[in-house]
Structure formats: C-alpha cells, structure tokens
C-alpha cells in the first residue's frame, strides 16, 4: 500500500538530513510574516494578562466579596479551560478550517468574552448581568471598624458567579483555540528554513509573550488596582481587537495551508481498534515476531495493513510517535500545577505582606507587579540565550536536549514553591506579633509587617524555570510531532498544562475542607492569616520532587528510543 513521504513522520527538529542554514538568513523573506504573528501574540498576551493578573483582587474586592480561595479557584479553573480546549481547537484547524481561520474566529470569540468584564465592572450595567447583591451578617469582616451590626457578602455565596464564569469560559475558549494554533502557525512561517530557524522562532515567540505580559502587568494591572477596574478591563478588550486586525492584515504575507484532514481522528480510530481487538493480540504478535529484523516493534503494529489491520503504515507510525510523547506530557502536570500558583496563591500571599506605596499616598505597588519580575527576567535572558549561550554550547556539542532542559526547569520550579513555603511560614509567625493594615484596591488587608520584596526569590526561580521548561516544552512538542500531527500534539501539550491547573484547583479545594483545614478560614474574606498556606506549598514541592525523579527516568528512556530510531533511518 502506498504511503506518504517518510519526512511526514520524522521529527521536525533534530533530524539529521536537513542542511544547515546560515544564522543571518533564517528569517530572510519571512520577516514580515513572523513580525505579524509575534505582534498579534504580544497584543493577545496583553489582553490575557489583563484578565488574569488581578482577577483574584477583582473577585476578592468589596463589590463581589469572594473569598481568597474561591477567587484563586476561579482563576485556576479559567486557566484549565484555556488549555483543555487546545486539542479540540487543533483538530478543528486540521480537519475543517485551517489554522488561519480558526485563529481568526477564536479572536472574535475572545473579544466577545472580554467585553463582559467592563460591563460587570460598571455599576450602570452590572445589575443587568448580576442582579442585586445579597447581603448577610457575618463576623469579623475585613474592616478596621467592624462591629456586630456590620454586614458583608455571605462568604459561601459568590456574587455574580454565573455571569463571571460565562465570561471566563468564553474567553477561555478563545484563548485556548488561539494558543493551540498560533504556535505551530508561526513555526510554519519558517519551518522550511531548518531546525535552527524553528528554534530561534520559538525563542522570540516566547520573548514576545513575556513582553506582552510586562506591558499588561506594568500598565494594565496598575490601572486596575489604583485607578479603576472599568478602565483596566477596557484596555485589554481593545488590545485583542487590534490583535485581530493585525492578524487579519497579515493574511497577504502568511504561509498558510488548507485543512487536509485531522490525524486526531485517525489516532482515535487506531487506538480504538487496538483496544477492541485485544483478542487477536497473540496471533498478531506472532506475525510481528516473524517479521522482526533487528529491532523490536510496537504492539500497535498489529493495526497496520501489512499485519492484517485496516490502517495505512504511515498513520500507525504517527500514532506510535504520539504514544511515546504522552508520558512526557503526563510528567509535566505537576510542573504546571506549581507554575499556575504564580498568579493565584502567590498573589494571595503578596496581599498579606507589606506592600509599599508608590507615586503618592493613595497608590500602592500592584500585587501583580511581582509577576512582572518573572517576565522581565525572561525578556533579558532569552536574547542572551539565543545570541550567546545556545551558539556557544552548540559549537561545542553541549547544547542540552529539550527533555534535559525541561528537567532543569522542574528543579527550579520546585525551588520556587519551596521558597514560597518557607516565606509563608515566616509570615505566619510575624503576623501574630506584628500585624499591619493596608488598603489595596479599596479593600483593607491585615498583613504581616514583612516587605513583599521577600517574594522576589520565588518569582525569579519560577522565571528561570520557564526559560528551561516552558520553551523547551514547546520545542519538544513541535519537534516530536510528525507533520501530520503538529496541531494535535501541540494541543495535547497545552491540554496537559490545563490538567495541571485543574489539579491545583482541586488540591486547593481539598485542603480547604474542614477535615484538613489548611485553607479553611471563612471569618475574613480573603484572609489567609488563619490558614496554613505553607503546608500547601510544601505539598506541591514534594509532589514536584517525586515527579522530577520520574521524569528523568521517562526522558532517558525516550531519548534512547529516539537514538535507536535515528540509527535505523
């Protein structure tokens, strides 16, 4: 039976056959297309971080009055949705619409969801979406002059939850669809220039992501916390609108390809055949053994037409490549669980540390600015990595593989959450004897008299982990993908990231139940002074440490398999 070109199944990076391209010419003739992709992604990230950077503060404020754990869970659920939708968006692009039109349509959906947040921020339209707030008497409200007659929103009820979750879901669907397709779409612009061009594109793609994060965290988050959330949500809505226009105008210079069928559908059929045909395993395995030469074949080979199955050789080989990659993605779940703490529990911790005033006595340092240090570090280090470190290591044959870089990233993210746990232990001791009140976003927080700058180590460590794990993860997902499964495998990479976010939300809910009680404190909305958040951080560090050991085993096994494959080519 005829099959496709073998290059359709070979990895896109790291192959032996592609001629080297001079470093100065890798983007020649494709600069405008790459610039349009990078600018669109930059603006999209401004919009994304405009939602996520202060969502905990927004929901925990006076208007909505959600508890700190409830606000953190909402953000973790939102992050999970944005990543879980990625494989399905990849399938839609491959099977029906093509990447360009899926990205374009996703940005429209993104914009519709973004428009809901200014509407619920504005008092004139909030009631139409949320109804009237229900008030109930509780004790110990977050006010310095609280009395038994004071009323606050009932902590068990989340005001405006249906409208807010609807907006988060719509935005999440848009974000996830863009995320799954814009990365491989951007790489498509330079993939014919060789692996060096693709590697450098991913470096600059990630650089653009973090520049967008800095713009959003530095400007939008400041406006939200110190000026008004209404203006702070209009800005990201405008940014996603401009991103849509930039991407639309780039159609004339983009390298695009039409939908040519989804390998995701073939993958499901082949795996279903394999699982439902186990009764034929012995006979097919015997046939495989008779046809073996020098290397061991997979049991999935029984699905091939040459072994009595109904599927083409190349399609089965694609699925075999996917099966080898899945364990790596599974091992990354705890990494993402820790990574997403940066915008949730890390922010809760910062709200209960002493935050300095800036510019005037009415403006305070935005809690989200700590996240900006992570992005600034990446902006500085990625160009150094791209221009100096990587070429230096490559000339000497010392450039680590993507899997080795991911392992290093896991180590640094473990150190980050461990540092957060140590800081939280110290904060809980200090707040007992030296408590201060501070006004943040029109809400009074009771904080330890310990400067928020002590959080810098955990943010720096998580930034270093991104340079190793996140960039290498994107590169691995793209390089390990046969050409027919680029969007599928890239989507699965983000899918497992979403699972990591849901795991974090689930763990937070678990440690909040009264039987455990680490985060069970309903007496003060958003207050973590009566909680043991440090235990949660130490739990995450322990899980990541165990997973790092498992990942090292998986990565060594995978690289050995790849080495054998290259020797056979």
Swiss-Prot record:
Stated role: Proton-coupled amino-acid transporter that mediates the transmembrane transport of L-histidine and some di- and tripeptides from inside the lysosome to the cytosol, and plays a key role in innate immune response. Able to transport a variety of di- and tripeptides, including carnosine and some peptidoglycans. Transporter activity is pH-dependent and maximized in the acidic lysosomal environment.
Gene3D superfamilies, alphabetized: MFS general substrate transporter like domains
Record GO biological process: dipeptide import across plasma membrane; innate immune response; mast cell homeostasis; peptidoglycan transport; positive regulation of innate immune response; positive regulation of nucleotide-binding oligomerization domain containing 1 signaling pathway; positive regulation of nucleotide-binding oligomerization domain containing 2 signaling pathway; positive regulation of toll-like receptor 7 signaling pathway
Top-level division of the source organism's lineage: Eukaryota
Name this protein carries in UniProt: Solute carrier family 15 member 4
Membrane topology: Multi-pass membrane protein
Keyword field contains Membrane: yes
InterPro entries xref list: MFS_trans_sf, POT_fam, PTR2_symporter_CS
Family that this chain belongs to: Belongs to the major facilitator superfamily. Proton-dependent oligopeptide transporter (POT/PTR) (TC 2.A.17) family.
Catalytic activity: glycylglycylglycine(out) + n H(+)(out) = glycylglycylglycine(in) + n H(+)(in); N-acetyl-D-muramoyl-L-alanyl-D-isoglutamine(out) + n H(+)(out) = N-acetyl-D-muramoyl-L-alanyl-D-isoglutamine(in) + n H(+)(in); L-alanyl-gamma-D-glutamyl-meso-2,6-diaminopimelate(out) + n H(+)(out) = L-alanyl-gamma-D-glutamyl-meso-2,6-diaminopimelate(in) + n H(+)(in); carnosine(out) + n H(+)(out) = carnosine(in) + n H(+)(in)
GO molecular function per UniProt: dipeptide transmembrane transporter activity; L-histidine transmembrane transporter activity; peptide:proton symporter activity; peptidoglycan transmembrane transporter activity
Chief place where the protein resides: membrane
Subcellular location: Lysosome membrane; Endosome membrane; Early endosome membrane
A cellular component term, taken from the record's GO annotations: lysosomal membrane
């Amino acid at each position: 039976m005829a099959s496709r070109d073998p290059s359709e199944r070979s990895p896109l990076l790291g192959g032996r056959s592609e001629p080297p391209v001079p470093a100065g010419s890798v983007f020649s003739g494709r600069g405008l297309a790459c610039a349009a992709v990078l600018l669109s992604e930059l603006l999209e990230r401004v919009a994304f971080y405009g939602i996520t950077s202060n969502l905990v503060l927004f929901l925990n404020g006076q208007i909505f009055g959600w508890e700190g754990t409830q606000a953190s869970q909402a953000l973790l659920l939102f992050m999970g949705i944005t990543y879980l939708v990625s494989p399905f968006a990849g399938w839609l692009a491959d099977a029906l619409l093509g990447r360009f039109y899926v990205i374009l349509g996703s940005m429209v959906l993104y914009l519709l969801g973004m428009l809901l947040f200014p509407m619920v921020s504005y008092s004139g339209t909030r009631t139409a979406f949320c109804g009237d707030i229900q008030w109930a008497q509780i004790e110990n409200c977050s006010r310095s002059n609280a009395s038994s007659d004071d009323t606050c929103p009932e902590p068990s009820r989340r005001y405006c939850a249906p409208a807010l979750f609807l907006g988060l879901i719509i935005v999440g669907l848009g974000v996830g669809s863009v995320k799954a397709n814009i990365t491989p779409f951007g790489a498509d612009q330079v993939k014919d220039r060789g692996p060096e061009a693709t590697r450098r594109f991913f470096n600059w793609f990630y650089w653009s992501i973090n520049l967008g994060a800095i713009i959003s965290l530095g400007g939008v988050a400041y406006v939200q916390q110190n000026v008004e959330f209404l203006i702070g949500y209009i800005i990201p809505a405008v940014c996603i609108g401009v991103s849509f226009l930039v991407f639309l105008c780039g159609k004339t210079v983009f390298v695009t390809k039409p939908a040519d069928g989804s390998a995701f559908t073939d993958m499901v059929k082949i795996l279903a055949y394999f699982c439902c045909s186990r009764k034929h395993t012995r006979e097919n395995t015997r046939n495989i053994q008779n046809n073996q030469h020098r290397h061991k074949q997979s049991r999935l080979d029984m699905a091939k037409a040459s072994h009595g199955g109904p599927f083409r050789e190349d399609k089965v080989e694609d699925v075999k490549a996917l099966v080898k990659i899945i364990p790596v993605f599974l091992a990354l779940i705890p990494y993402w669980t820790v990574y997403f703490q940066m915008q949730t529990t890390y922010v809760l911790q910062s709200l209960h540390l002493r935050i300095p005033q800036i510019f005037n006595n009415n403006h305070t340092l935005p809690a989200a600015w700590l996240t900006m240090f992570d992005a600034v570090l990446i902006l500085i280090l990625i160009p150094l990595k791209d221009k100096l470190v990587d070429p230096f290591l490559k000339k000497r044959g010392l450039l680590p593989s993507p899997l080795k870089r991911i392992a290093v990233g896991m180590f640094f993210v473990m150190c980050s959450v461990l540092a957060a746990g140590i800081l939280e232990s110290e904060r809980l001791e200090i707040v007992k004897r030296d408590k201060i009140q501070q006004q943040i976003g029109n809400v009074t927080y009771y904080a330890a008299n310990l400067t928020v700058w002590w959080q810098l180590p955990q943010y720096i460590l998580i930034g270093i982990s991104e340079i190793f794990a996140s960039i290498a993860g994107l590169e691995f997902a793209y390089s390990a993908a046969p050409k027919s499964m680029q969007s599928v495998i890239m989507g699965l990479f983000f899918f497992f990231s979403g699972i990591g976010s849901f795991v974090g939300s689930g763990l937070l809910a678990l440690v909040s139940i009264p039987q455990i009680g680490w985060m069970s404190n309903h007496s003060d909305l958003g207050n973590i002074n009566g909680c043991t958040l440090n235990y949660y951080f130490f739990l995450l560090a322990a899980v990541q440490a165990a997973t790092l050991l498992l990942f090292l085993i998986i990565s060594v096994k995978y690289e050995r398999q790849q080495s054998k494959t290259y020797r056979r080519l």
